[in-house]
Amino acid sequence: MKVNSKTLQSVKEDLLNIEQTLNKLIKVNNPILSAAAKHLLIVESKKIRPAIVLLVAKAIDKNKKIKTSQQRLAEVTEIIHTATLLHDDVVDESIIRRGTKSVNKTFGNKIAVFAGDFLFAQSSWYLANINNLEVVKAISKVITDLAEGELQQNLTQFNTYYSIIKYLEKSFNKTASLIAASCKSCCLLSDFDQSLNSKFYNYGKNLGLAFQIIDDILDITSSSTALGKMTTSDLKLGNLTAPVLFALTKNSKLFKIIEREFCEKSDISEAINIIKETNAIEESFDLAYEHIEAAINSIKDLPTSSEKDSLIEIAYDLLNRYK
């Protein structure tokens, strides 16, 4: 998830602190496991998920203060996200992540799985030490959602009767749940109006759904270099995303290509051409835009602040990834 660096200006120093802290938090005696666990954490990235948590913390505090527990929540969010990437790359046999070799490509599948498990365990430890039961419940549910989402995806590969509703349910579990719960948990850790919980939960939920839809568009339309990971990987695996599902309603030939599981050499390129020739990409973008609008509307009544503006800008930056 990429955003304009100016959008994160108000939490720039806080993010630098988090990057330094993350390296210290991941403690393990085995050097191979340590290197594998830190492989993606230390790769330069926007760290947008922890940035969102920090922006929420400042947006709801008139003194613009970030509590220690909120910073730790931001760190836990990034650790969980990284753990999911390690496991996803093993399942999807990915070789590139964040513009570098994936952990499974560098260290092998077993080490990648162990490293992902280790990061989940570390996140649970640090989460428990935040010492807030409601936050523990919210983030623990995320880990359940992540597993369920991955299973939903793998059990529906090449299923041409898969619906947009089911796709959004899966996308919530795999992507949006973590952002939604982190935003809500940041409010739970504040000393301010708890009625904001649902507003920020809905912001995170819709932002996460929009991100996944845009990411799925780019999997069809972008390059591996621009995206920082292999493109058309979901399509090849039979993971039917929004552009594919919309295209299926307009071209019966795509049904046949998918149902034979791309067994012919030209099937992938032909499927991509069909998707691009329909207005499936545009329909997918419109769906993402609906969720962006819903995210922004969730927080539009907040008091004016640079942090609120940044949260809104992050939403629009997602759309600019496609444009």
Curated annotation (Swiss-Prot):
Keywords: Chloroplast, Isoprene biosynthesis, Magnesium, Metal-binding, Photosynthesis, Plastid, Transferase. It is an enzyme of class 2 (transferase). GO terms for cellular component: chloroplast. Coiled coil: none annotated. Its cofactor is Mg(2+). Mg(2+) 1 binds at D88, D92. An all-trans-polyprenyl diphosphate binds at R97, K174, T175, Q212. PROSITE patterns: POLYPRENYL_SYNTHASE_1 (PS00723), POLYPRENYL_SYNTHASE_2 (PS00444). Transmembrane segments: none annotated. Its EC number is 2.5.1.-. Binds 2 Mg(2+) ions per subunit. Isopentenyl diphosphate binds at K46, R49, H81, R98. Its main location: plastid. GO terms for molecular function: metal ion binding; prenyltransferase activity. SUPFAM superfamilies: Terpenoid synthases. Mg(2+) 2 binds at D88, D92. It is found in: Plastid, Chloroplast. The keyword Ion transport does not apply. InterPro entries: Isoprenoid_synthase_dom_sf, Polyprenyl_synt, Polyprenyl_synt_CS. GO terms for biological process: isoprenoid biosynthetic process; photosynthesis; quinone biosynthetic process. Pfam families: polyprenyl_synt (PF00348). NCBIfam families: prenyl_cyano (TIGR02749). Belongs to the FPP/GGPP synthase family. Possible role in synthesis of the nonaprenyl side chain of plastoquinone or in synthesis of other prenyl chains such as undekaprenyl pyrophosphate. This is Prenyl transferase. It comes from Cyanidium caldarium (Red alga). The gene is preA.
